[in-house]
Amino acid sequence: MKGGVFAPQKEAETIIALKKAFGPDIPVRIDPNATWTLETSIKYGKVLEPYIQYFEDPCKGQQTMGELRKVLKTPLATNMCTTSFSEIPGDILYHSDDIILADHHFWGGMEATMQLGKICSVFDRKLSMHSNSHLGISLMAMAHLGCALPEIAYAIDTHYPWQKEEIIKGGRIEFQDGALSVSNEPGLGVEIDQVQLKKLHQNYLECGIVDRNDEIEMQKVKPGWKVSENIW
């Protein structure tokens, strides 16, 4: 569950309610997007220990996450404080997480993500994958990595169900029981639909956004919204 939106107590109560509703076989996670202070993360991390599979980026920075890890039993996951090979030394120094949520775009592609898996195995880290909004090419790259990386110990994330359009032939990729089948076709097993690609490229040209700006999307829902840190 994406957190850092409502008061931490309300979000903790929501997680507990979800876990009780889903039952013991469905894992639940929370990601406050580093908006909680260390003190808040400790307080509600202890409350949530019996309910969550892992605790993703509750507070900001490797050193702060390392302090949190000293007092919680729940595994800590990140796709914010360790996102590149240059940040691995700090990750090891502070033991800021137990699970690195790799994004194959940020880490440098599929081969680089495979290398990350080997580093995780050396330093006793688990691996899963982070997803932002993406289309079928990126999704299938993720699926292939999920099959190829033995270090992946948790179901990987995707925002794909939020997307309505697609640029690959055959349209949207279907999930079956929460999983994807990896194609036996060459490469990623998908082909580009040139008509759809041209259409979405035109959307890009017309939208006027050339850099990522999460505030614009949020302001559609809440005018005046600004990115904040340690707001709770």
Put a short name on every predicted segment.
Residues M1-R69:
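Metal-dependent enolase-superfamily TIM-barrel catalytic cores that perform enediolate-based chemistry
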Residues K19-F22, E49-I52, G146-P150, H201-Y204:
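Structural signal for hydrophobic packing residues in well-ordered secondary-structure cores
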Residues V47, K60-A77, T82-G187, E191:
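Shared catalytic-loop signature of beta/alpha-barrel
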